[in-house]
C-alpha cells in the first residue's frame, strides 16, 4: 500500500493462470449449453453464448439436438434443465480436459438426475468480450450421459 492506494505487486501471465482459466472456460461453456428453460428466447441466448466458447463440434451437437426436436420438446413440456459441475481435470501440456457433472431435469411429474462426462481440447484464441478466457473448446464430445436417479413428484 502506498498510503491508501494499493500497489500492483506483480502481474500474472496467462501461462501462470492457465489451469484456473481453462477450468473456468470449460465450466462456463457447460453452464450455457446444458442450463435450459422452457423459453425459446432463453435457449437461443444461451446457445449463442455457448457457441463463442466451442468450435464446430459444439455447433454440430446443437444442430443434431435441434433437428431431433429436443429444444421444442423442452418448451412443449415445460422441462427445466440444470447442470452441476463435480470436477474438471485439465492436462496443461496436452491442453485436454474432462468434465464431470450431473444434470437435473425437472418435468411436471418427475425429476431425473443424469451423470454427464465430456472431453475435449482447448486452443488459445484472442480474448474478446464474448470469450473472456481467450480459449476455444475443440473436438468436444460426450463420453457418458446416463440416468442415475429418477423421482416422481408429489401432486399437492
Predicted features and spans:
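Solvent-exposed, amphipathic alpha-helical segments
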Residues: 25-36
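Structured, amphipathic secondary-structure segments that form assembly/contact surfaces
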Residues: 2-20, 34, 38-156
Amino acid at each position: 500500500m502506498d498510503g491508501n492506494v494499493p500497489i500492483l505487486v506483480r502481474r500474472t501471465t496467462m501461462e501462470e493462470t492457465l489451469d484456473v482459466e481453462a477450468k473456468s472456460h470449460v465450466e462456463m461453456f457447460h453452464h450455457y449449453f446444458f442450463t435450459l428453460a422452457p423459453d425459446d428466447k432463453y435457449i437461443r441466448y444461451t446457445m449463442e453464448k455457448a457457441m463463442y466458447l466451442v468450435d464446430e463440434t459444439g455447433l454440430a451437437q446443437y444442430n443434431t439436438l435441434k433437428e431431433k426436436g429436443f429444444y421444442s420438446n423442452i418448451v412443449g413440456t415445460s422441462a427445466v434443465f440444470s447442470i452441476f459441475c463435480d470436477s474438471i481435470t485439465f492436462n496443461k501440456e496436452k491442453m485436454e480436459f474432462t468434465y464431470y457433472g450431473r444434470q437435473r431435469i425437472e418435468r411436471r411429474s418427475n425429476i431425473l438426475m443424469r451423470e454427464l462426462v465430456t472431453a475435449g481440447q482447448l486452443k488459445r484464441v484472442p480474448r474478446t468480450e464474448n470469450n473472456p478466457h481467450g480459449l476455444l473448446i475443440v473436438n468436444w464430445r460426450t463420453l457418458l450421459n446416463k440416468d442415475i436417479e429418477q423421482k416422481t413428484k408429489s401432486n399437492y
